[in-house]
Amino acid sequence: TKEFKQVVTVNNVSLEVKQGEIFGLVGPDGAGKTTMIRMLTGIMDVTSGSINILGAADSEQVKSRFGYVPQKFSLYGDLTVMENIRVIGSLYGESKENIAALASEILGFTNLLPFKDRLADNLSGGMKQKLALAAGLMHKPEIYFLDEPTTGVDPVSRREFWQMLYKLNKEGTTIFVSTPYMDEAEFCTRVAFMHNGVITTCDSPQVLRKKYPYKIIEL
């Protein structure tokens, strides 16, 4: 639970995310998704309750084992793509040799290698999100938290971004992603729907479809 001046933004939420799955937190703006992820990553303290990540009750203890992409682009706009990657690599304590090897590998994975000398400020919205994803991969996280990574991104870039998430997941990375888009719920192993700080339902997309008592029409 999280309260701000007697306003409850996350209300008695209980979740278990299984290793190796893509877990989606779906809900409209103001549902509490960002607050939830900030609590999970240790950026924000809980008002009551506890969080356990990778066997640790304190996320600080396992900070080096998970990655986080915030909703707002937070890298350096006046640095190039490669310079941003090198800075993040050095913050994680990687050697220059490791940074050089990892940077080429990760920029290749995210299709950003041809743009390695472009300033981050000059990237499109979709490419900025790819850069944020790449930066978070510099320490090979076991769990990756992504807060609405495709919001405001064009449909083609959204599809490419999800393809990269699938590749990461196949390599063993657990993905926890929030989104306001209902169609992205279909891409997840399991989905939790959040509204006004409360989890209303949680299950696989297939089971949730079967439980829905009305006809579903896709346009």
Features from the language model and the residues they span:
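Helix-to-loop junction immediately C-terminal to a conserved catalytic motif
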Residues: 41
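Conserved ABC transporter NBD signature motif
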Residues: 48-62
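Conserved ABC ATPase "signature" region
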Residues: 86, 90, 97-115
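Conserved ABC ATPase signature
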Residues: 119-123
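Catalytic Walker B motif of ABC-type/P-loop ATPase nucleotide-binding domains
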Residues: 144-147
